[in-house]
Amino acid sequence: VNIPAENVYVGEDSVAEQLKDLDLLDLAAATGMKQKECTVKELKEALKKKDVVYTGDYTDLEYKKLVTSKVDLAILTGEVLPQKEDKEVSSDSDSKKKLTEKEQRELLKDMTERFATLGIPMIVDRSQDEKEELAKAEWIKVYGAIFGKQDEASQLFEKIEKEAKTTDTVKEAK
């Protein structure tokens, strides 16, 4: 991963929120969310203005658009990782399709090979797989390290940690 990345593929809202918190959302060049699906206002507006390109979700990425957008880092969600049970995925036509574990593995293998061929490093954000809220929030430190904003990320995490302790104290008092 070249640090800092300049043109990022943002797989979903949770990643976009983390980038927004670090004032890095302007690095988003491409996304896996359609405008109507996006809940991050700034990213939704960038999609509308075509400052950010929709390149498809992980099941149907348009690699040519990633190259055209000069993406130099792809941040994907843990959804890309194979699961033991059949997984329902949506396609661009908004229909649902079930993928077997083998199909999921093949999809991941194909995707990683294509990213490698294109010279685009990829990161799988596992924050949504974390059980504890603080563990989810700690992913901000990962993005701080990747984008050279360690101090800002540490401050944000400390703030979240402090708020969590305050909330726990209030719960204990009840």
Where is each model-derived feature located?
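A short, structured surface patch at a secondary-structure boundary
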Residues: V1-R105
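Extracytoplasmic substrate-binding proteins
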Residues: N7, D51, T68, D72-K174
